């Protein structure tokens, strides 16, 4: 719908389109026009929606096409994705569209609503025919409502409601209300079929015309606003198109109005009659359904009567059997008569149930489907949902009734079963089988019931029923259908029935347990063994029987569902066990016991999943044993039976038929299996009995899963067998009685044998865990693979105690009631033996698991069993994490399978951490299972082992499970996450080894082929690039942006994409090669141990990285994959998920999916690189992968582009070799980064070691294609952002500027990355980046003033500096620093050219064309020439020819200068000196521009700086530039001493800061210093990267609120309402941290739309399934958007500063503040490795937040902070402004570019509200400035405090003094909280620096600029506190008005950059901060205080004092200290 397709209903009626157009000329025309023009309108509206979050925008967009333009997330939720978006659009003209809209609206309200209610003439309403007739009978009118909805965009009321209304129902309601009245009443068109002409009234058309005109006006105003705001030309074009379409629609409406005036409303009655007919049909259908329900009820009553009869017969049998109880218990044959009678009764009962229910099910299904379809149609088409609601309610009621009836039936059955149980306990051998069959049938029915109950959620929140419904979607669907037939019952009745069904299910479960026990007894071996354990476990079971039995009964359903889902496991097991009902009963008993045990130890979900998982395991185990005994026969039977049951399970009749035949065939096999099961169970029981209760929890959980697997399978077989029950049971029970006797002996023997076999298997597993895993995975094939899994399972039982757990489950279940006691009595001896054997097995398992090292081998085996049984085994894993998680897996088998691999992705990091812990616990002992039980009883066993097995199984079942993983790869989001756990890598090492050998050969071939192709493409690309470069950059990019046609860019982009894909594939192949070799190596080596290490490391490590992965759940977990990049690559991750594949995917798609895949994959394979990246950096990278968050959708492309860039880098910079080299380099860098990352590095290093073992270079090549991605690995945050930037850079970006900056940054980053590998290559990349920046510069050169050229030149300088620094090996810090610098330069260009949006767009478009280094180099040279000319001109004007310096200094001085020197003599500095001279010439204006250059433009920049890194770069660059400006100013200004001092101090501080930043942030920064690069310092001055830690804290704080909410709704489906509530919650939580300004509003709108779009993908999915991905998605989006927002805030502030010196001063202050923060944080960062990065991020926030605040407060305040801030950006201006330091006391409106452009206003709306309320737009209003200053002085002081806090660490000079001066300036109330802290901090540092500042101030006051510069620079590096603190308020004002408090908080947290970052991240607006500004002082108070401060500021002495502290801040603004008074004035 993004293309503006039809609404949701239109999608449904897509087939009808031709009918539409064929039905009538009008319809056809309408459709045609609707499709064609509306499509455009939709696009424009869609884009407009994207652009404008405003309701008016929405309205305009809605006017275009509320539904047709689903670009808005809301609309997307409405419109089915299957509906062709543009079909209708293309077919209809605008006038016809208007007509169609009217018709649609009329139809929606009249025809459609009625249709949904009643049968459509088209059959549309008929529930039964609903599906078919919808497509067949959908007539144009059907489309009309949808088209009308689409055309609603024309209709303001309709479109607005729809857009505003998230759900189509709401839209329809609004539509109905707005249109139905007019259209239906007035304009009901008789063309229900769309054949009649719309009979709309002229009044309606007139109203619509008015609406359209209103929309046109709105759209025009929006377009004007966009143009004014320098919005993207695309948006403007979209609005233009929208306006055009609206006008066309207006014309069409006019024409249509004319037509209508000429028409007769004769068709309205037709429509009405049709609607009435439809309603009548619907009513008839409802009556029919009710009759059917009644018939079903009668059937149920009959069944109940039969049940009673059976119960009576059973009672009779009980009488006869009571005497035989002993014999039956002892295995003595019971009279065959009782068995026959029971079998007959039970079979009859079940047959009757089947006869009654299964028929009802199809009818119900049809009815439910038809009703649901009708509802959907009516809902989607009909504006009013009320009618649909009744239908749904009716359906729900019917479902409830059905469920209640089923419950009643179940109750009767349960009563019968209880009777049977009592009898069966007496005659356990005879009755149990009959009752078993019955119970099996009952279970089948009950399962259906319970499943529906679960779906109905009427189960009273029964987790079990819900779970069962989730695990058994098919069964639950059937049951739901049945319930729908019965669903006409009242909800209360349904609830009652559900409760009854639940109780009866429990009873049935108990009975089933009993029967299973009896049948197990009949299978003597199983019974004895099981009963011993069952008595033990029955005690546990009895405790939880009530809850668990339901689960167990549903488990059969779950098993069937799982079987359906995992057609390999339960049903197959069931078929295997079908013959052996006893085995089934054993399994059922086991299920019971497992359920009970689970109930004890595990929540029902866990129990269920464990059951399901372990049922499979158990069945697999039984089959394993069976395989051991009769592996082939059982496998064949189980295969056929499983397949048949899986296939037939939905159709129970067929299943029963097939199962009957299979049961006959499986009887013998079941007997064998019974023997095997008896042996296994005995062995398992022996093993498991030993574990403590908690261990039993784990063991039971696992065993229960296994046994329940067999039990469920057997239950399924029972269901299947019920048809065969009579014959089979008679024969079977006769055989059973014999068998039981034989098997009792055999089981004992077999137990010994099995114990021996298990010991052997354990020994084999220990010896060859890989082989076991491979065998297990091989056995995980549909049947035999599953059986081999079983084969491994016995070993696993020992190893994983899964088999023993299975044994425990049967025993536990057999313990049920009297039967348990009789069995216990009978089997006390057996229990003793079993316990002893269990202890032995336990010891063996413990030893074996310990030997396996964390029981990884066993966990792989268990995983293989579960994965063999089904990938559902993940479910137990998930259930380990959450029982609800279990339903995640249960509801979506595939996703859960893979999620199960990943521990259900909940948060791979978190889950993995759990897994790691579990593994660690496992490593400590097998008894750790009890530890896992609480959260993952089975999950420890199941998740670890299951994951291992999964991965082994999936790899093994490359055809079956593993390839499904490939499918899941495509679904990569949810599945890959799980698969990407280390388990996948482990299994890939182990089991995939075999597959991989073949795949490796193929991959090698493919690799060679792809390498050749890549080389060819690279050559072609080079050729094309050269050609394009020649074309594009011939004359300094002489080609206008127009000339450089987008086609060329497109070609280049496509080439890059092709190359990237080829490179990516090649890298993947190479990675796979290496990984395969690694796997081949490690398989034999220590596949388990490395995995366990990786697990531990990745788990413990991912936990922190996955902090957002889980939140990103699908942001960046594999639903990280689901997130922009993550979830989209689910198929990718699974396919390449295994370490070899995984790294390749990891490198590629993890780039594309960077966070999801990377998060997931880091866990699996390269958690080292990716996990590190996965932490917040990963979300950050995901943000980078998202690139600009606006490019969420582009994220993958950007990632791909990043890959593409990498190929470019490779191709142009060393080709594929580089990736490997880079990989190696990345490893080292990654390790260094890891060391920087503290905890993550260790785990990531461990992973990295492991991954490097497997991937070697791949670990650093997580993004093999994109060295940047590898760089991501290097620097989790910066590298990630850089990688994303690089990827974005290569990706054609919607925002050319973004792309340019991205290119610059990404190329710089790539260069930085490559610099270590290939410095020369790095240079081309940098040149490429620079070239992009410079290409825009040449273009801009004309438009740009020298400032622009200088800015571009700075960009080039930074690029070269980046090149140099990257060449020097400061890769990432230089890279990021350069990227940030470049981006800030680009931002400056943008900010300087904000008035020239089109120029910027063209410029960046051209820059985008600079795809190759050659082009970039040419553009760079051209820009250099231009800049040199401009600089030389400016220098000549200044009397200095600094031109050579500009062109050469950045190249030479950067490399030549020491870090401190580079800071002083940075190219930027030289350039800035030139700038400065030029600026001096231009004077304050140039300074403003320069400052703005230094700062980042806000309007266009938000888009360009979509990448967080890009945005961050702006702040860093601003800081760096500010410092350089300060240096330049200091140097150029008259006060050479001051300049020298500033420069020296700044150099020292800059060097220290840069070194600190390098140390804290990353070695690359140090390398920057090593390769002394001013850019290094400039960007090393912690590139104002967003404080990822702060963002992490903030996002965590948000996610802390969201996660509980999601947990509350884990069982729910992600409805649009739920997603909307989540989105609103997130937005609310996010907004809580931000001030309300236009930019903030825009940001929140953007965030909301992005969240909506990102969350829309989860619509309709079970929250359990996608919750993790959802969280990851949300967290990723939040991270990206918040980072982007902060960067944008900085940009907005900076851009405003560009226009306003105050802003420049603020930016300068922000830069200094960033420097102070940087130095401080660097110092802190040195203490805390992430501190450097945090510094960047904090700077971002501090600048974004603090600078804004400072702008608002300090700019207004006449205090020194203004001067300080001014010093930063306006030090040049300080010469001018310091002269009048107070004179330029800009109000917030002035100081913030946002105020001028409106974005800043949104950001700091609160402040601005105050400021603007005081003097909304007054630029230099002293009162405003003072009031704002007071207000913001608090912020400033806070910010200053933050800076000082930072600076005290970095510079222990100014912090005390600044507070002092600030105290003088700031009113005491403002001071207290933060100033006191500042004073505390500053008093420490200030005493020293106070003198220097005071001295500086003294000189500054005379010449504020020089001194402020000196003081500022002196203070900025060292005393950044003063300057930064003083500037910081301004910087924060400019940088982060919205995030003041966080910055303030940072200030509060003195000398704790991390803490302050955390506070920033956690609290954008801290209570301390906000109250100081907002809460503590009202505007009036603030004004008063500001006035007071102004009065204080009036004092020159105070100003001097304050300027001593704050002089740097306001020095630019305050040219003269005396002006301080002027400011206050």
Swiss-Prot record:
Residues 1086-1096, 1189-1198, 1756-1768 have a biased composition (Basic and acidic residues). Residues 2-1458 are annotated as: Mediates interaction with DZIP1. Expressed in the hippocampus and dentate gyrus, the columnar epithelial cells of bronchioles, the olfactory epithelium, the pericardium and the inner segment of the retina. Ubiquitinated. Undergoes monoubiquitination catalyzed by the E3 ubiquitin-protein ligase MIB1 in proliferating cells, preventing cilia formation. Monoubiquitination by MIB1 is inhibited in response to cellular stress, such as ultraviolet light (UV) radiation or heat shock, resulting in cilia formation initiation. The modification Phosphoserine is found at residues 65, 68-69, 93, 110, 116, 119, 159, 370, 372, 384, 593, 644, 859, 864, 867, 870, 957, 974, 985, 988, 1182, 1185, 1228, 1254, 1257, 1259-1260, 1315, 1317, 1571, 1695, 1729, 1766, 1769, 1777, 1783, 1959, 1978. The keyword Acetylation applies. GO terms for cellular component: apical part of cell; centriolar satellite; centriole; centrosome; ciliary basal body; ciliary transition zone; cytoplasm; cytosol. Self-associates. Interacts with BBS4, BBS8, CETN3, HAP1, NDE1, NDEL1, MAP1LC3B, GABARAPAL2, and GABARAP. Interacts with CEP131; the interaction increases in response to ultraviolet light (UV) radiation. Associates with microtubule; association to microtubule is reduced in response to cellular stress, such as ultraviolet light (UV) radiation or heat shock, in a process that requires p38 MAP kinase signaling. Interacts with C2CD3. Interacts with CFAP263. Interacts with SSX2IP. Interacts with CCDC13. Interacts with CEP290. Interacts with PARD6A. This is Pericentriolar material 1 protein. It comes from Mus musculus (Mouse). The gene is Pcm1.
């Amino acid at each position: 719908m993004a293309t503006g397709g039809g609404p949701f209903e239109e999608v449904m009626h897509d087939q009808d389109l031709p009918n539409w157009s064929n039905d009538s000329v009008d319809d056809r025309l309408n459709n045609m026009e609707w499709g064609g023009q509306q499509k455009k309108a939709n696009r424009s509206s869609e884009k407009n929606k994207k652009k404008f979050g405003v309701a008016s925008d929405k309205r305009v967009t809605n006017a275009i096409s509320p539904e047709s333009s689903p670009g808005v997330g809301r609309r997307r939720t409405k419109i089915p994705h299957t509906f062709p978006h543009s079909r209708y659009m293309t077919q209809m003209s605008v006038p016809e569209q208007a007509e169609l809209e009217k018709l649609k609206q009329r139809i929606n309200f009249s025809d459609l609503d009625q249709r949904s209610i009643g049968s459509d003439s088209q059959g549309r309403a008929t529930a039964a025919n609903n599906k078919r007739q919808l497509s067949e009978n959908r007539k144009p009118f059907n489309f009309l409502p949808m088209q009308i909805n689409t055309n609603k965009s024309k209709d303001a009321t309709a479109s607005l409601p729809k857009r505003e209304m998230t759900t189509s129902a709401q839209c329809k309601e609004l539509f109905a209300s707005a249109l139905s009245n007019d259209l239906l009443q007035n304009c009901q068109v008789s063309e229900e079929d769309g054949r009649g002409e719309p009979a709309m009234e002229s009044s309606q058309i007139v109203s619509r015309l008015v609406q359209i005109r209103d929309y046109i006006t709105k759209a025009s105003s929006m377009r004007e606003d966009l143009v004014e705001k320098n919005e993207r030309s695309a948006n403007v074009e979209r609005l233009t198109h929208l306006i055009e379409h609206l006008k066309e629609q207006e014309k069409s409406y006019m024409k249509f109005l004319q037509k209508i005036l000429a028409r007769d409303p004769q068709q309205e009655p037709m429509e009405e009659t049709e609607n009435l007919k439809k309603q009548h049909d619907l009513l008839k259908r409802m009556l029919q359904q009710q009759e059917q329900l009644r018939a079903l009820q009668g059937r149920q009553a009959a069944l109940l009567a039969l049940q009673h009869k059976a119960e009576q017969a059973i009672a009779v049998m009980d009488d006869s059997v009571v005497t035989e109880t002993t014999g039956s218990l002892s295995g003595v044959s019971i009279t065959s008569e009782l068995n026959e009678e029971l079998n007959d009764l039970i079979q009859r009962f079940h047959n009757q149930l089947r006869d009654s229910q299964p028929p009802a099910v199809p009818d119900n299904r049809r009815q439910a489907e038809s009703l649901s379809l009708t509802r959907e149609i009516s809902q989607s088409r009909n504006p009013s949902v009320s009618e649909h609601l009744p239908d749904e309610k009716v359906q729900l009621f019917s479902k409830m009734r059905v469920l209640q009836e089923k419950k009643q039936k179940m109750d009767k059955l349960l009563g019968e079963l209880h009777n049977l149980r009592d009898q069966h306990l007496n005659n356990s051998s005879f009755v149990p089988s009959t009752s078993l069959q019955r119970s099996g049938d009952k279970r089948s029915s009950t399962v259906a019931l319970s499943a529906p109950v679960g779906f109905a959620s009427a189960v009273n929140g029964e987790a079990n029923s819900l779970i069962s419904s989730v695990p058994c979607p098919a069964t639950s669907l059937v049951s739901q259908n049945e319930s729908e037939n019965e669903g006409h019952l009242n909800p209360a009745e349904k609830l009652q029935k559900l409760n009854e069904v639940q109780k009866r299910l429990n009873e049935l479960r108990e009975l089933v347990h009993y029967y299973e026990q009896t049948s197990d007894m009949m299978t003597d071996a199983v019974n004895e063994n099981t009963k011993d354990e069952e008595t033990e476990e029955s005690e546990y079971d009895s405790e939880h029987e009530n809850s668990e039995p339901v689960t167990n009964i549903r488990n059969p359903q779950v098993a069937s569902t799982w079987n359906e889902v995992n057609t390999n496991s339960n049903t197959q097991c069931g078929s295997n066990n079908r013959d052996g009902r006893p085995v089934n009963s054993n399994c059922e008993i086991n299920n019971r016991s497992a359920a009970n045990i689970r109930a004890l130890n595990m929540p029902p979900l866990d129990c269920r999943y464990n059951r399901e998982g372990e049922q499979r395991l158990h069945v697999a185990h039984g089959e394993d044993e069976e395989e051991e005994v009769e592996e082939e026969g059982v496998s064949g039977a189980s295969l056929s039976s499983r397949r048949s049951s899986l296939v037939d399970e939905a159709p129970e009749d067929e299943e029963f038929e097939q199962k009957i035949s299979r049961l006959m065939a499986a009887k013998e096999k079941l007997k064998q299996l019974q023997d095997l099961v008896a042996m296994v169970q005995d062995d398992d029981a022996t093993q498991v009995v030993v574990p403590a209760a908690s261990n039993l929890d784990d063991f039971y959980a696992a065993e229960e899963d296994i046994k329940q697997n067999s039990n469920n399978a057997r239950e399924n077989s029972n269901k299947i067998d019920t048809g065969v029950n009579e014959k089979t049971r008679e024969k079977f029970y006769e055989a059973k009685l014999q068998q039981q006797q034989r098997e009792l002996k055999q089981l004992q023997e077999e137990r010994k044998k099995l114990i021996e076999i298990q010991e052997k298997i354990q020994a084999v597993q220990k010896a060859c865990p890989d082989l076991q895993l491979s065998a297990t995975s091989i056995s995980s094939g549909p049947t035999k693979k599953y059986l081999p899994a079983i084969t491994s399972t016995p070993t696993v039982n020992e190893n994983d105690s899964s088999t023993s757990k299975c044994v425990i489950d049967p025993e536990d279940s057999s313990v049920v009631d009297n039967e348990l006691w009789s069995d216990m009595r009978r089997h006390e001896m057996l229990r003793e033996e079993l316990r002893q054997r269990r202890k032995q097995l336990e010891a063996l398992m413990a030893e074996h698991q310990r030997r396996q090292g964390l029981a990884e081998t066993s966990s792989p085996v268990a995983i293989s069993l579960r994965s063999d049984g089904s990938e559902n085994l993940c479910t137990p894993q998930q259930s380990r994490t959450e029982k609800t998680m279990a339903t995640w897996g249960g509801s979506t088998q595939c996703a859960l399978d893979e999620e199960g691999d990943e521990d259900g992705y909940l948060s791979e990091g978190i889950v993995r951490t759990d897994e790691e812990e579990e593994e660690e616990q496992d490593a400590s002992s097998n008894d750790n299972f009890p530890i896992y039980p609480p959260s993952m009883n089975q999950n420890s066993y199941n998740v670890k082992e299951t994951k291992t097995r999964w991965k082994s199984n999936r790899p093994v079942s490359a055809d079956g499970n593993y390839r499904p993983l490939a499918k899941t790869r495509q679904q990569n989001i949810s599945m890959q996450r799980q698969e990407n756990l280390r388990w996948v890598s482990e299994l890939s090492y182990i089991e995939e080894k075999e597959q991989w050998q073949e795949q490796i050969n193929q991959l090698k071939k493919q690799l060679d082929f792809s390498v050749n192709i890549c080389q060819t493409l690279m050559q072609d690309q080079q050729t094309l690039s050269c050609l394009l470069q020649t074309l594009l950059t011939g004359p300094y990019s002489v080609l206008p942006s127009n000339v450089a046609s987008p086609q060329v860019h497109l070609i280049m982009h496509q080439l890059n994409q092709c190359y990237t894909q080829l490179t990516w594939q090649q890298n993947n192949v190479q990675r796979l090669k290496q990984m395969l070799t690694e796997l081949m190596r490690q398989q034999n080596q220590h596949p388990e141990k490395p995995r366990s290490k990786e697990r531990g490391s990745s788990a413990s490590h991912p936990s922190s990285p996955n902090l957002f992965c889980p939140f990103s759940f699908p942001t960046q977990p594999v639903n990280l994959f689901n997130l922009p990049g993550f979830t989209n690559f689910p198929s990718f991750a699974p396919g390449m998920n295994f370490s070899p594949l995984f790294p390749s995917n990891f490198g590629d798609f993890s780039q594309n999916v960077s966070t999801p895949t990377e998060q997931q994959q880091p866990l699996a394979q390269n958690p080292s690189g990716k996990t590190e990246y996965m932490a917040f950096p990963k979300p950050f990278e995901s943000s980078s992968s998202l690139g600009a968050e606006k490019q969420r959708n582009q994220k993958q492309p950007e990632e791909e582009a990043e890959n593409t860039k990498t190929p470019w880098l490779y191709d142009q910079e060393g080709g594929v070799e580089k990736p490997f080299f880079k990989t190696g380099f990345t490893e080292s860098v990654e390790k260094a980064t890891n060391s920087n990352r503290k905890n993550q590095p260790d785990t990531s290093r461990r992973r990295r070691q492991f991954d490097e073992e497997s991937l070697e270079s791949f670990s650093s090549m997580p993004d093999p294609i994109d060295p940047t991605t590898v760089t991501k690995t290097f620097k989790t945050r910066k590298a990630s952002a850089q990688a994303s930037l690089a990827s974005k850079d290569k990706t054609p970006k919607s925002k050319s500027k973004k792309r340019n900056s991205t290119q610059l940054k990404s190329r710089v980053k790539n260069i930085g990355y490559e610099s270590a590998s290939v410095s020369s290559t790095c240079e081309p990349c940098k040149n490429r980046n620079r070239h992009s920046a410079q290409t825009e510069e040449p273009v801009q050169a004309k438009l740009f003033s020298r400032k622009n050229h200088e800015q571009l030149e700075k960009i080039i300088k930074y690029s070269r500096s980046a090149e140099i620094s990257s060449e020097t090996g400061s890769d990432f810090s230089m890279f990021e620093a350069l990227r940030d610098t470049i981006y800030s330069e680009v931002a400056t260009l943008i900010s300087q050219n904000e008035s020239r949006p089109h120029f910027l767009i063209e410029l960046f478009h051209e820059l985008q064309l600079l795809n190759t280094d050659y082009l970039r180099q040419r553009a760079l040279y051209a820009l250099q020439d231009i800049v040199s000319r401009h600089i030389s001109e400016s220098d000549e004007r200044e009397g200095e020819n600094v031109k050579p310096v500009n062109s050469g200094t950045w190249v030479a001085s950067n490399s030549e200068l020491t870090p401190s020197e580079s800071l002083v003599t940075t190219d930027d500095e030289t350039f800035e000196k030139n700038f400065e001279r030029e600026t001096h010439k231009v004077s304050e204006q140039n300074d403003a521009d320069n400052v703005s250059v230094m700062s980042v433009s806000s309007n266009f920049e938000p888009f360009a700086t979509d990448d967080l890194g890009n945005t961050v770069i702006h702040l860093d660059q601003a800081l760096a530039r500010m410092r350089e400006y300060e240096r330049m100013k200091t140097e150029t200004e008259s006060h050479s001493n001051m300049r020298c001092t500033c420069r020296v101090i700044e150099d020292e501080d800059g060097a220290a800061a840069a070194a600190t930043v390098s140390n804290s942030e990353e070695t690359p920064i140090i390398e920057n210093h090593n390769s002394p690069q001013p850019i290094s310092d400039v960007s090393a001055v912690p590139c104002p990267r967003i404080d990822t830690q702060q963002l992490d804290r903030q996002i965590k704080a948000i996610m802390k609120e969201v996660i509980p909410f999601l947990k509350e709704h884990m069982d729910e489906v992600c409805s649009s309402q739920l997603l909307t509530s989540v989105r609103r919650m997130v937005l609310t939580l996010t907004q809580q941290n931000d001030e309300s300004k236009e930019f903030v509003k825009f940001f929140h709108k953007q965030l909301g739309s992005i969240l909506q779009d990102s969350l829309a993908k989860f619509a309709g999915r079970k929250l359990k399934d996608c919750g993790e991905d959802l969280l990851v998605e949300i967290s990723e989006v939040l991270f990206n958007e918040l980072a982007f927002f902060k960067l944008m805030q900085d940009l907005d502030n900076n851009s405003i500063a560009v226009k306003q010196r105050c802003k420049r001063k603020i930016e300068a202050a922000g830069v200094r503040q960033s420097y102070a923060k940087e130095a401080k944080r660097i110092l802190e960062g040195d203490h805390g490795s992430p501190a450097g990065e945090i510094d960047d991020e904090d700077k971002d926030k501090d600048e974004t937040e603090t600078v804004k605040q400072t702008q608002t407060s300090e700019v207004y305040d006449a205090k020194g902070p203004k001067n300080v801030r001014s010093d930063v950006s306006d030090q040049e201006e300080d010469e001018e402004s310091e002269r009048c330091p107070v004179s330029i006391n800009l109000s917030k409106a002035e100081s913030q570019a946002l105020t001028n452009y409106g974005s800043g206003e949104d950001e700091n709306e609160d402040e601005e509200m105050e400021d603007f309320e005081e003097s909304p737009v007054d630029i230099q209003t002293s009162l405003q400035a003072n009031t704002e200053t007071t207000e913001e002085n608090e912020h400033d002081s806070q910010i200053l405090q933050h800076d000082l806090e930072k600076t005290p660490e970095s510079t222990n000079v100014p912090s005390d003094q600044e507070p002092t001066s600030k105290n003088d300036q700031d009113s005491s109330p403002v001071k207290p909280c933060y100033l006191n802290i500042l004073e505390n901090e500053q008093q420490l540092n200030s005493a020293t620096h106070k003198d220097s500042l005071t001295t500086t101030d003294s000189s500054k006051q005379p010449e504020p600029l020089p001194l402020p510069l000196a003081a500022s620079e002196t203070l900025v590096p060292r005393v950044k506190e003063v300057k930064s603190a003083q500037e910081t308020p301004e910087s924060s004002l400019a940088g982060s008005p919205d995030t003041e408090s966080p910055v303030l908080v940072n200030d509060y947290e003195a000398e704790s950059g991390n803490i302050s970052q955390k506070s920033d991240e956690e609290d954008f607006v801290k209570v301390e901060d906000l109250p100081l500004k907002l809460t503590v002082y009202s505007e009036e108070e603030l004004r008063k205080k500001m006035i007071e401060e102004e009065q204080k500021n009036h004092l020159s002495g105070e100003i001097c004092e304050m300027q001593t502290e704050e002089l740097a801040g306001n020095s630019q603004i305050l040219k003269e200290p005396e002006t301080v008074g002027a400011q206050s004035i």
